[in-house]
Amino acid sequence: MKLPIFIADAFTATAFRGNPAAVCLLERTLEEDAHQQIAREMNLSETAFIRKLQPTDSFTQSSRFGLRWFTPVSEVPLCGHATLASAAVLFHKIQNRNSTLTFVTMSGELKARRAEDGIVLDFPVYPTFPQDFHEVEDLIKAAIGDTLVQDIRYSTDTRKLLVRLSDSYDRSFLESLKVNTEPLPAIEKTGKVRGLILTVKGEPGGQTAPYDFYSRYFAPWVGIAEDPVTGSAHTVLSSYWSQQLRKKEMRAFQCSRRGGELDISLRPDGRVDIKGGAVIVLEGTLTA
């Protein structure tokens, strides 16, 4: 087995920042177990597998492909940064000629289109609903202790818990906050929660670039203690902060150690455009 494989840093214009994803190009069907084995070997938060939908398709000419995403421990239904990385590989390395690519996925058809300063992902928007604090109190206290919480929401579509911290906290507080993810899967084992979003309101600017909101994302339930930059989490965050800020156009920053920027535009058709950059940092051949 020889497979072309790449690593791209997504949601960044600079190498070694953003969120790295492995991207594997499949000329033919791969044995089912091999997807997980390769993802475990790559040991990144996600490995993406792009496959041809028809034997006559071409990675350089076709505009529709199948796409799946695997963490080191399981397949996931949606991954934004690995979709961005996949589009970057096809556009910039494979020299695909199309302006828009369509990926057939577990979350339906997702589109990625070229932009002057990045790649725009066309994703669904997932609403959030008020969550009773007492139902998730043990989970939140285990993760962030006595940190003040302003709002708690739950996304039934994505099984993500969104915790908005007090507006008295700023970016530096969120960045330095020690989050204990190790006990979370044992505390929440019903399957209701598969990801934890922590978020704070942004600031008007000053000496730093203005962002509408900041976030961090944790998914120990699928083997990811903290994800550097998470496109799928922003399908939830965009819905929440659009309502809170009464804005359709927003700029977001995910406050992981690597950090990443996302430009968000909510559309009239109930979907969201998420724009980001990507830098390909490695290309090679998987020979196992």
UniProtKB/Swiss-Prot annotation:
The keyword Membrane does not apply. It comes from the Eukaryota. Signal peptide: none annotated. GO terms for molecular function: isomerase activity. The keyword Isomerase applies. Its EC number is 5.1.-.-. Keywords: Isomerase. The active site is at E46. Gene3D superfamilies: Diaminopimelate Epimerase, Chain A, domain 1. Transmembrane segments: none annotated. One of its GO terms (biological process) is biosynthetic process. Belongs to the PhzF family. This is Phenazine biosynthesis-like domain-containing protein 1. It comes from Mus musculus.
